[in-house]
Every structure is written in structure tokens, then in C-alpha cells.
Amino acid sequence: MSKKNPWQIFSEECKGVADAYQRLMSEANFGGVLDEKTRLLIMVGIYSTTRDPVALSHFVGEALKAGASKRQIQAAALLPFTVGVSSAELSIPLIKEICDIERR
């Protein structure tokens, strides 16, 4: 299996689409009104809600790189908890695993 994450592979295989997505995300953030860490924490909350482990893993890693703490990421993932426990059941173990790997 490739050591590249799915986004890296997608970006290489579909560069134009990936670039268009990045531009769309920038516009959705009105050119950067949210700082990067905040934006990434929101993405963690979104993908926790949709129970998408691939995207959630990506954004947890990106949030860590942007300076978010494990607790901040967990808090973002738990916000959707009010719409159902299944989002937390997916998110918290995944966050723990990624944070444990990042510490190595």
C-alpha cells in the first residue's frame, strides 16, 4: 500500500480538480477570515459529523501541524456529539491514534 495519504494521491492524479477545491475552500473562508487552526478544527467537527475516517484523519493531522492540541481537536470532534454518539465513537479513538503516532 502507498505511504501517501489519499489526498496526496488525489492531488497528483487530479491536480486541476484538487487545485479548484483548494480555491473553493479559500473563497468559502472569505480569503482567510478564519485563522488556519480554527478552520482546521471546524473541518474536524464537520468530518466527525459525517463519519468520514479518511477526511477526519487528514484534518486531524493538519490541525496538529497548525498547532492545535489534542484536547482542542477532541473538543472540535465532540461538538457534533449532540446529534449522535456515533460521531464521538469514531472520532475520539481516531484522534488518539493519530496523536500517539505524531508523538513518536
Where are these regions (language model features)?
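C-terminal structural segments of small proteins and small subunits
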Residues: 71-99
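Mid-chain, well-packed structural core segment of small domains
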Residues: 51-77
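Alpha-helical transition-metal enzyme core signature, strongest for iron centers
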Residues: 14, 45-49, 80-87
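Acidic, glycine/proline-rich low-complexity segments that act as flexible tails and inter-domain linkers
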Residues: 1-40, 61-65, 88-104
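Hydrophobic alpha-helical segments
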Residues: 49, 57-59, 85, 98
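Residue-level preference for alpha-helix termini and adjacent loops
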Residues: 9, 33, 55, 80-82
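Amphipathic, charged-and-aliphatic alpha-helical interface segments
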Residues: 39-53
